[in-house]
């Protein structure tokens, strides 16, 4: 979606051969109106237009979201760059600087070929986020029972686990507003289609977004679960420990925002 929006701006308001926005409005969007030379980072000092920041490359602008989400429009290069990242404020300039360095290199080489594209696709196919470590210190007590929680900031009512196969578990999560069922695998990112609805969705405060990639691992008699939402910026890490008939949950979110500003610790009600 970010790339499509950028292409729409690059096309001066045209999409699928239809002029949806007058070109003069696009020109106004990409014009600096506010002086920002008091900012710290190089790409924040060049000025601000209507929702767009001026960038270091000639005639380049970007719209910027929280945590390193960028849609960069480069009219001179006839190029759009869409970036979704999990970055805090101090990391944002590093992302842009790396982008300009890469852009300068490909302009210097001034070539591309089918072989280059094949090599790039092969390289990209091997990239993945690191898997959680696993020492097989399984906690059998957490399976086949439901752990219930009292009132908490996550609105978490209950959670249960079941072993589907030696390398796959199912996690059933009940919140105040919905049920959330997913699969997680060892040494693999398991894609989930949760098909759950949340009428009270709020990108600032909603916990557990749709369709995460899930990976888990056992370590030091704890179950670790990581949920990656690759259509956005957030990653949730959950650590489960079982002690004295209770489930101890450590919820650690990134990036830090609203309810995600700090880790949360929960203890389930005792299993009778």
Roles of regions detected by a PLM:
Residues 1-10, 14-39:
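A conserved catalytic-loop motif detector
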Residues 1-14, 69-86:
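Active-site-proximal alpha-helical segments within enzyme catalytic domains
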Residues 6, 13, 17, 49, ...:
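Glycine-centered flexibility sites
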Residues 12-17, 109, 187-189:
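Short loop/turn hinge sites at secondary-structure boundaries
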Residues 27-83:
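Active-site Gly/Thr loop motif
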Residues 57-59, 69, 87-88, 230-234, ...:
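Short Gly/Pro-enriched loop/turn and capping motifs at secondary-structure junctions
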Residues 116-272:
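Peripheral terminal and inter-domain segments
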